[in-house]
Amino acid sequence: MSRYDLVERLNGTFRQIEQHLAALTDNLQQHSLLIARVFSLPQVTKEAEHAPLDTIEVTQHLGKEAETLALRHYRHLFIQQQSENRSSKAAVRLPGVLCYQVDNATQLDLENQVQRINQLKTTFEQMVTVESGLPSAARFEWVHRHLPGLITLNAYRTLTLINNPATIRFGWANKHIIKNLSRDEVLSQLKKSLASPRSVPPWTREQWQFKLEREYQDIAALPQQARLKIKRPVKVQPIARIWYKGQQKQVQHACPTPIIALINTDNGAGVPDIGGLENYDADNIQHRFKPQAQPLRLIIPRLHLYVAD
């Protein structure tokens, strides 16, 4: 497929996302809102976009105010829709839930709408990350050449729809991206970097090349069977834990966007019990279960690469 055809599909898919989101928010407002609870988080400024989050103060919103914030959030796709001081790199998150009363017919209609939106979002992300054939550093410029000001994460982020929950509880999750690697795999990656000399601020090209050579030597000095692990921290994430009484099971969802909960009164479902979201404090985390960590030694800090001792 030609680059021109891909751009046409990209723009066409994005227009469909906008249209379907507008239709969904209009449709939701035609339904009876049983309960709504969302939690706004502090604005991340451009100056603080890379700073670790040690505390997060939560503001709760209820009822129609919560619904208005949530429906606007679903359609928040461009930096032009937010304050000039807000970071365009830090994701805008609005955990919470909207609960609507539905019958069998309207439940199916809303399920199909959300499924279609999520399909379009997945297709759009595939075009940018795979079909474009561009490295991650070049994708930003390419997307914004055709869709200026787009917040790509918001365009990718799918909607979560659930049916007839009994209880909904909110909390925070601290995660790491973990990837196990062999010594030879890391050496191969470093070889590729060495073969393409470049400068990486604040280092000159020569300084960066020297840094890579030192890293290569450090990895090459390890035994071939050494166990290496990338353990990169991810910023704390709001989550929702959903309990389904009939199935006697709990399901956990990431909750950067308000969940849409459909309450089917045709089937005798009732309004769920919804909990709050506490302020986040990194110094006061209580772990339900924390397994014994494997002893690790940091070997390449910029890659968050560790070797198991």
Curated annotation (Swiss-Prot):
It is found in: Cytoplasm. Its main location: cytoplasm. It comes from the Bacteria. Transmembrane segments: none annotated. The keyword Cytoplasm applies. GO terms for molecular function: DNA binding. One of its GO terms (biological process) is DNA replication termination. It holds the Pfam family Ter. Keywords: Cytoplasm, DNA replication, DNA-binding. GO terms for cellular component: cytoplasm. Belongs to the Tus family. Trans-acting protein required for termination of DNA replication. Binds to DNA replication terminator sequences (terA to terF) to prevent the passage of replication forks. The termination efficiency will be affected by the affinity of this protein for the terminator sequence. This is DNA replication terminus site-binding protein. It comes from Salmonella schwarzengrund (strain CVM19633). The lineage of its organism: Bacteria, Pseudomonadati, Pseudomonadota, Gammaproteobacteria, Enterobacterales. The gene is tus.
